[in-house]
């Protein structure tokens, strides 16, 4: 789940306190129970912090002697703080939330606790989770470094009114990627609306299609870059086709221009996690209620957009690790809590038990009464994990830079990909 919004309250460190009834050698034993309080520190980001906060009354009912302190920061600041804490073993929380885009960086090191075996035995619960999400947290050597809590099954959200004006139907968007671009030409001619926010969106999804077993997004299992491959060539070519035909608004996700494009009907489609439908409904473009629908991604593609995990640092306070894991289990393996997070924050459950509920059959008024949650559940079933690499974030920056040179300066695609390949080769083993 890519919930990167909101102003977060900064903080760090682990808070724990214990107290007991005082006695002296000559005093008679007290019959009153000891008041022992443990404080767990949970480091999170919006809107995971709100999900945790909402779960605390139910947690306290089960564990009245365990307090939970939430330390919340903006998404990037949070992960920077966790990187520092793991590298210095100082200021470590008991539980840390990690977004999938950052998990690879953490997984390459030795800072996270392996939860697969005793005393946690997470591997026993593997079948309870969406396969690809559990696999994302599993290293090539079989260590499981985090527990998935929510996922972001990909969807194509589109404006039915704009399609109707262009004489198009959903299948015109989804039959093929080339057909999707061709539909964009008709939409632009008939309505003036752009097909998508940014041509980069096309690249982002297409490089995730057609991966061979064992291949990562940018690197293979031996850290060799995979940029000079047909999927990158096609991704760049179709992104360039979008830009050349002026089908993208050239706006970046979460910018004010992006949200205005949705409000004013200037952007006809958006590929994203299913959670975006909730954001459009609640604050991005509530006035467009009923005009949107959700479809599977074009050409039978399935992809994940975001996802959140809970982890324990290897050097976190050992005395609190059992209770920290109990808290993680409560957040991730409790059907009631998983459904509550979905209903309140559009955090699609990673727990399979929480994917069978009448809530999935409810029509969504924002999507014109469509029972879209069924489609999102189906998409989650088809998504497959690919290995993450510690240089994935760097690789994404390189690819984005080279694509921008193609889109904005007319750089030829073979040269752009060759330059990216060279840079990734230099960085792959660092």
Language-model features: locations:
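Short, well-ordered beta-strand elements
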Residues: 35-47, 66-71, 94-95, 145
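Hinge/lid segment of periplasmic solute-binding proteins
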Residues: 100-153, 181, 210, 291-293
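Extracytoplasmic/periplasmic substrate-binding proteins
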Residues: 236-326
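Extracytoplasmic/periplasmic solute-binding protein
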Residues: 140-149, 154, 178-225, 267
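Extracytoplasmic "Venus flytrap"/periplasmic binding protein-like
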Residues: 58-129, 165-167, 261, 265-269, ...
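Short, solvent-exposed loop/beta-turn-alpha elements that line the ligand-binding surface or hinge
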Residues: 116-129, 173-175, 195-196, 215-234, ...
